[in-house]
A protein has these predicted regions:
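Ribokinase/PfkB-type carbohydrate-kinase core domain
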Residues: 3-113
């Protein structure tokens, strides 16, 4: 990384269409901090999971694995890997795969359920 390049942070987290949470919140915060967030949604929800009924859900595990492969092929290096909501075993495996592919990246694991 060149000294003037922003730090790249892989954000492995859910994306809620409604509700002030998840990737919708962390991406602009990291960007304002001068970082380059890279979104990797584990699951897409119609709303957040706290008190708004049962949200519609779209699993992102297959997309996530394909995206990780693409980033590796491009030679992308992450300075940090941040995890948020991991909706199941496949999403946990996705985070573990990212940790294996970028062992030098700082790991920030936020457990959410």
């Amino acid at each position: 990384m060149k000294p003037t390049e922003p730090k790249k942070i892989l954000c492995i987290h859910d994306l809620s269409g409604m509700g002030r949470c998840s990737l919708a919140v962390i991406l602009p915060v990291l960007s304002v901090m001068g970082c380059q967030p890279v979104a990797l949604p584990t699951v897409v929800f119609s709303t957040h999971t706290g008190g708004l009924g049962t949200p519609a859900r779209l699993d992102g595990a297959a997309y996530g694995l394909a995206a990780l492969k693409h980033y590796r092929e491009m030679g992308v290096e992450f300075d940090c890997i941040y995890t948020g909501y991991l909706g199941g075993e496949e999403q946990v495996a996705l985070a573990e795969k990212a940790f294996d592919l970028w062992p030098a990246a700082r790991k920030v694991v936020a457990v959410s359920y």
